[in-house]
């Protein structure tokens, strides 16, 4: 089993790096503003038709463009979900959603969270899935990448007042990156058996003579961008555990690769644009170290399973509850880490059925800000926030003004960094406290005790950090949870984006100083260790008390009771 685990992790990382390196070089061209020569005229025609100026923006103009663009998308998606009952491409005749569920779902997909308080095959029409959710899968992903582009430019520009043009960035990211790669992935999924049709649901008779309904729909096209854009919202309720979404071990492997592909490629892009590839390599090393350790811990926990099973006569303690036999323990454990290290949230098993320790690791990966590769764009700018915090701490220790890539890090930068890092923990802890201290919050908990608290903590961690996965034992389709989680998702998304863009505006205006004898190298093993330690320390100080009340207590109850 250990050899199989090693081969799975090693092969995944090898293929990921081989694919991410050339994509990173291509993304670097987009960051530096180089359009594809073949599409230069197409771009010019689009801007003429839209009446859009190609002039660059300062940070607050960029932020306003991103914010208004997403608010418009939220309003349109909300209207579509409310009125789907009277719109076409609804062969099952599903009615419109309730206002609170429609609002929660609209916020969820606009913020790249894809939290789902519903089951897609029994709630949404094909039009809502395609024109609503799938469109936002592209646009929310493009938003995150665009913000990362702006921050990368800020580190590399000298005495500049602008960080790029939001409209051009979103357009190029969608047209040149997300659409073509999604098309290739969708075709591969179709070849493996993923559904792609517009048929009404099929009613069949099983071998036992019972009647069964098989859901249909344009699944593969949505599945591709769901993974590539680290969105995570499934066409079906059980997400990638459904054989119509994720039919084979090969599609499972490709889905994991798709989740990490752009976040890893952006690290290469960062190093290339900065003029020092080793800067990007250092980020990849730091992310990979945390990722591999997390995978090993979850695999160990799920293989150790439940010690009480052997007492009941079971031949094995391995925890297969809630898992698909076609994937097995190792691939399922790795998928759970990939999807929560990134802000994806897609699942190929029920995380609520993991062991206490196995479920705690995905929860913790979300709580540290999903900076282990992370979401498309958000993973990189989230990790760069920790980089700024690390160089600030290192500067305090050696008595020098902190700097990164030749840019001095001043008080304003650190205030914005602290604000961005503290937004999501505040939402998680205060939201969890509100849920468990009110009757309407406690009413949704189906499993009392430590695990019930873990379900609430997981839900708020997932929403605030824009992940979207869940512990299924919590009833969240209520006005209380729909509104609470929608607030956490929106503030968790834009409450981080705005400080990041403010940092970008501050950094791009500064001169880039040459490195001196006392400059801290930000690419070697020492800095990688400091960066990993900072991420772990912030996560530990913030969430250990809450984790002790939930998964840690549950783990001790399981292993110390007879």
Swiss-Prot record:
Pfam families: KdpA (PF03814). InterPro entries: KdpA (IPR004623). It is found in: Cell inner membrane. GO terms for cellular component: plasma membrane. It is a multi-pass membrane protein. The keyword Membrane applies. The keyword Transmembrane helix applies. The chain crosses the membrane at residues 6-26, 62-82, 132-152, 170-190, 253-273, 283-303, 327-347, 356-376, 379-399, 416-436, 483-503, 526-546. Keywords: Cell inner membrane, Cell membrane, Ion transport, Membrane, Potassium, Potassium transport, Transmembrane, Transmembrane helix, Transport. Its main location: membrane. Coiled coil: none annotated. One of its GO terms (molecular function) is P-type potassium transmembrane transporter activity. Part of the high-affinity ATP-driven potassium transport (or Kdp) system, which catalyzes the hydrolysis of ATP coupled with the electrogenic transport of potassium into the cytoplasm. This subunit binds the periplasmic potassium ions and delivers the ions to the membrane domain of KdpB through an intramembrane tunnel. NCBIfam families: kdpA. Belongs to the KdpA family. The system is composed of three essential subunits: KdpA, KdpB and KdpC. This is Potassium-transporting ATPase potassium-binding subunit. The gene is kdpA.
């Amino acid at each position: 089993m250990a050899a199989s685990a090693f081969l799975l992790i090693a092969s995944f990382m090898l293929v990921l790096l081989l694919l991410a390196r050339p994509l990173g070089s291509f993304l670097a061209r987009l960051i530096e503003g180089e359009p594809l020569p073949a599409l230069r005229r197409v771009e010019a025609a689009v801007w003429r038709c839209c009446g859009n100026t190609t002039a660059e923006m300062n940070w607050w103009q960029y932020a306003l463009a991103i914010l208004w663009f997403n608010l418009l998308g939220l309003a349109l998606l909300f209207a579509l979900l409310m009125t789907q009952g009277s719109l076409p491409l609804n062969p099952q005749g599903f009615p419109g959603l309730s206002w609170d569920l429609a609002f929660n779902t609209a916020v969820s997909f606009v913020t790249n969270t894809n939290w789902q308080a519903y089951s897609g095959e029994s709630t949404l029409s094909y039009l809502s899935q395609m024109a609503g959710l799938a469109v936002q899968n592209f646009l929310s992903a493009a938003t995150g990448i665009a913000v990362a582009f702006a921050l990368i430019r800020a580190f590399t520009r000298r005495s500049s007042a602008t960080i790029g043009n939001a409209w051009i960035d979103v357009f190029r990211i969608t047209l040149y990156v997300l659409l073509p790669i999604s098309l290739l992935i969708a075709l591969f999924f179709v070849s493996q058996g993923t559904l792609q049709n517009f048929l009404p649901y099929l009613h069949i008779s099983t071998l036992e003579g019972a009647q069964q309904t098989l859901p249909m729909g344009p699944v593969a096209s949505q599945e591709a961008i769901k993974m590539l854009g680290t969105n995570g919202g499934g066409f079906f309720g059980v997400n990638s555990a459904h054989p119509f979404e994720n039919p084979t071990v090969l599609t499972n492997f490709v889905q994991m690769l798709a989740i990490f592909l752009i976040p890893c490629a952006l690290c290469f892009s960062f190093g290339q644009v900065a003029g020092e590839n080793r800067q990007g390599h250092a980020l990849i090393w730091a992310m990979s170290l945390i990722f591999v350790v997390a995978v090993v811990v979850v695999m160990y926990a799920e293989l150790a399973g439940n010690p009480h099973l052997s007492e009941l006569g079971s031949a094995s303690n391995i925890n297969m509850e809630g898992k698909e036999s076609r994937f097995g323990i190792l691939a399922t454990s790795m998928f759970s880490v990939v999807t929560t290290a990134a802000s994806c949230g897609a699942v190929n098993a029920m995380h609520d059925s993991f062991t206490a320790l196995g479920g705690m690791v995905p929860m913790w990966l979300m709580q540290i800000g999903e900076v282990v590769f992370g979401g498309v764009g958000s993973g990189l700018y989230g990790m760069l926030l920790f980089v700024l915090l690390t160089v600030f701490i290192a500067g305090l220790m050696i008595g020098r003004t902190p700097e990164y890539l030749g840019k001095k890090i001043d008080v304003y930068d650190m205030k914005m960094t602290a604000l961005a890092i503290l937004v999501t923990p505040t939402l998680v802890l205060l939201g969890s406290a509100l849920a468990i201290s009110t009757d309407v919050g406690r009413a949704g908990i189906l499993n009392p005790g430590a695990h019930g608290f873990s379900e609430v903590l997981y839900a708020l961690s997932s929403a605030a950090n824009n992940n979207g996965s869940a512990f299924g034992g919590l009833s969240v389709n209520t006005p209380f949870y729909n509104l609470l989680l929608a607030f956490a998702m929106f503030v968790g998304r834009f409450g981080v984006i705005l400080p990041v863009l403010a940092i970008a505006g501050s950094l791009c205006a500064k001169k880039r100083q040459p490195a001196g004898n006392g400059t801290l190298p930000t690419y070697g093993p020492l800095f990688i260790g400091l960066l990993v330690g900072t991420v772990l320390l912030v996560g530990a100080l913030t969430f250990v008390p809450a984790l002790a009340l939930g998964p840690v207590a549950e783990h001790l109850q399981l292993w110390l009771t007879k």
